From Swiss-Prot:
SUPFAM superfamilies: YbjQ-like. InterPro entries: UPF0145_dom_sf (IPR035439), UPF0145_YbjQ-like (IPR002765). It comes from the Archaea. Transmembrane segments: none annotated. Belongs to the UPF0145 family. Highly divergent. This is UPF0145 protein MJ1170.
Length: 89
């Protein structure tokens, strides 16, 4: 497992961004699950950091046709930019 640096800012003090790998998105039933999923996706891309992280949520309704009622579901999304950074000496 890579030590993943995560930040809501677009810069990391003491580090320089050497490569931008792209947008990453994770989702889950709570903010922590969404962030964990985001980190897994970034690791698979070869990133060692994710910058500009934002978390949002969406309320949807699942219709249960057999029982004729709706169940609300809240899904959290985490998104940011996967990057490779190097420590500045």
């Amino acid at each position: 497992m890579i030590l993943m640096i995560t930040s809501t800012t677009d810069n990391l003090e003491g580090f320089k961004i050497v490569k931008y790998l792209g947008v990453v998105i994770g989702y889950g039933d709570d903010p922590d699950d969404a962030l964990e999923d985001l980190i897994d996706v970034a690791e698979d891309m070869g990133a060692n950091a994710v910058i500009g992280i934002r978390i949002s949520n969406e309320l949807t309704t699942e219709i249960i046709s057999d029982e004729n009622y709706a169940v609300p579901e809240l899904t959290y999304y985490a998104y940011g930019t996967a990057v490779i950074v190097e420590k500045i000496d």
